[in-house]
Amino acid sequence: MTPKKEQYARKAEGWTDAEYADARAYLDHRAELIATLGAPLRAGEEVLDLACGDGGLADYLHGSEYLGVDASSEMVAAAQRRGRNVVLGDLNEYAPPQPVAATTCFRAIYYARDRRAFFERVAGYTEKKLVFDLNPRQYGVDDVRADLRAAGFDELVLRPFFSPQRHALPGPAASLLHGLERSGPLARLLLKARFSYLCAAFRGGRN
């Protein structure tokens, strides 16, 4: 086990609470956008969460069936102790037993050994959309869009995601930031300094 994996394993118990200053506000906003961005999800549809950690997102995807996958056995055990439906697997190799409506991958696209091949694999078992985050200061949007198109995802919706991970905000401040996600030029200006996009890739006209 590499030192990084050992550190990850040691933090498995209580991972979500330790990683977010306000886990409820952060994950609730993310779950809302997973359900509504791009092709909307209907009640009862299944969401596959790749590299899910302890599966904390499961508690906020109200109305959806949740399946989490993580490569750390310690994270999987921590998730299962909380009653979350999480199994062991590598995002580069895992395929669910049956197709899912949506797949999400949070802060983990960089774990893909080959990004285009990863998108192609996900497209093979995802019926509606792939939702993931993208740091525009680290990855070229046009390059990612090209890889998605090659995999069959011909539509891409990008939504600025202005929820701080390490800082808890009072309700009015959080609402203001969420409003700025739709502010166009101002949102793009903020993205030059920090934050990321939440992206929904899907097949146009077939969802």
State the predicted function of each range:
Residues 94-102:
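A short acidic, Gly/Pro-enriched loop at the edge of an enzyme's catalytic core
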Residues 138-152, 159:
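Short alpha-helix
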